[in-house]
Amino acid sequence: MLVSKKPMVLVILDGYGYREEQQDNAIFSAKTPVMDALWANRPHTLIDASGLEVGLPDRQMGNSEVGHVNLGAGRIVYQDLTRLDVEIKDRAFFANPVLTGAVDKAKNAGKAVHIMGLLSAGGVHSHEDHIMAMVELAAERGAEKIYLHAFLDGRDTPPRSAESSLKKFEEKFAALGKGRVASIIGRYYAMDRDNRWDRVEKAYDLLTLAQGEFQADTAVAGLQAAYARDENDEFVKATVIRAEGQPDAAMEDGDALIFMNFRADRAREITRAFVNADFDGFARKKVVNVDFVMLTEYAADIKTAVAYPPASLVNTFGEWMAKNDKTQLRISETEKYAHVTFFFNGGVEESFKGEDRILINSPKVATYDLQPEMSSAELTEKLVAAIKSGKYDTIICNYPNGDMVGHTGVMEAAVKAVEALDHCVEEVAKAVESVGGQLLITADHGNAEQMRDPATGQAHTAHTNLPVPLIYVGDKNVKAVEGGKLSDIAPTMLSLMGMEIPQEMTGKPLFIVE
């Protein structure tokens, strides 16, 4: 007869952060007798779910994708922005073999180094500090012809904010005594992602032919002329920057071209125009054979050099379970199904051996404040059945309510969402205890605990950078450890299951069996 398994259950209450202040706090305002009792009577602690502790920039709010990757990985997983910040700070960036190789090859052949990217402090698609580091790398390695092609932002930054960035780079080139800003164009053209190839073509011609609708002696003059035409940063038309007597910066075969955007979606189209031999988005007036480097991998089918290939995560929680012949279930509503599967598995789409998945449809409503309980009753019913089935060694479940209803900014609805969750937690905890299992309750980031922005008085619809609760329910006598973070959860689960923790997991168990 099959032995009935006593599952280790992880319940992730999405957007359920911890905030001492009671004002505009849907979690405090809700009637939550179950969570209150668990917090009062069970081992518990607070853990970090934002900023550096989850691989984001300092104090940046967490999000569901990052949260679940860290939860499943058992180690801090650095996002591209932070990974680059760290590498530049410790100077590993300046020794990156792909970047140095491209620069050295161009320099030794007397060719130019072209650097292009979104010149922005927004930190969403790129960061100007990374572009500055690339300029320094090229100069340090002796490149004489360094051309910067600046894509202007105005979406992740204020609509007219590019001047200070352009000034900074013009001053840098003056100090270096070589290199210059060679072109400016709005991201509307250079960073399209909807196959509007007529836009991309304007950027491509500007880069390859050094031909644009306008020309200016300096980047700042070119920008000011665009503003006079009533073009904000995002929509600045193709402008060649070239003073009298300066050589033109048209791209030639053998030149190096470094694309400094780290986010893929808006980098793919213009990259394909340079890299794909069979490109058919538009008829290219000039096909150049440049040494093209993508800062990160924009798509697996774009065959060109990558300075920072995706870091593959070995021995995530899901993979480790499979290697140890354990059974696991992932269960959530539509809104967070990808998070407990793809993201929790470190970006792996396929399920592991012994991994089942249950998807509960989220309600078809315009906004979730209209149905704050969402599909939590059905989700709980299926989860309780799975706990009692004896089939699973571990179960990962996400309740989306705190986040999805928190995003609406409607306080009354968020309170109802939290109250619905309290009933669900009660059912789940009872089921786990009835089969002798163990339960961890936590969150991936905050949201519902802050429903109004104190500075503006407007509804606060974003995530927070506040800590999240972690509660243990089970028959083990455990002591909580302070100072934890999301990447400590997987090691905590393994330790409570009496399993070895793989060496790749650098997180630490947060409940120590006494």
Swiss-Prot record:
One GO biological process this protein is involved in is:
carbohydrate metabolic process
- For the ligand (substrate), the binding residues are H125, R155, D156, R187, R193, R263, A264, D265, R266, K336
The annotated active site, in chain numbering, is S64
Coiled coil feature spans: none
Write down a Pfam family by its short name. Answer: Metalloenzyme
Q: Name the pathway it acts in.
A: Carbohydrate degradation; glycolysis; pyruvate from D-glyceraldehyde 3-phosphate: step 3/5
EC number of this enzyme: 5.4.2.12
Summarizing activity control, the record says: Insensitive to vanadate.
Q: Kindly list the positions annotated as binding Mn(2+) 1.
A: D403, H407, H463
- Show the GO cellular component annotation of the record: cytoplasm; cytosol
One GO molecular-function entry: manganese ion binding
* Cofactor detail note: Binds 2 manganese ions per subunit.
Cofactor(s) needed: Mn(2+)
Q: Where does Mn(2+) 2 bind?
A: D14, S64, D444, H445
UniProt entry keywords in alphabetical sequence? Glycolysis, Isomerase, Manganese, Metal-binding
Q: Provide the catalytic activity annotation.
A: (2R)-2-phosphoglycerate = (2R)-3-phosphoglycerate
Q: Which PANTHER family match?
A: 2,3-BISPHOSPHOGLYCERATE-INDEPENDENT PHOSPHOGLYCERATE MUTASE
Name the family: Belongs to the BPG-independent phosphoglycerate mutase family.
Question: Anything further noted?
Answer: Inhibition by vanadate is a diagnostic test for discrimination between the cofactor-dependent (GpmA) and -independent (GpmI) phosphoglycerate mutases.
Role played: Catalyzes the interconversion of 2-phosphoglycerate (2-PGA) and 3-phosphoglycerate (3-PGA).
Q: What is this protein called?
A: 2,3-bisphosphoglycerate-independent phosphoglycerate mutase
Organism whose genome encodes this protein: Escherichia coli (strain K12)
Recorded name of the encoding gene = gpmI
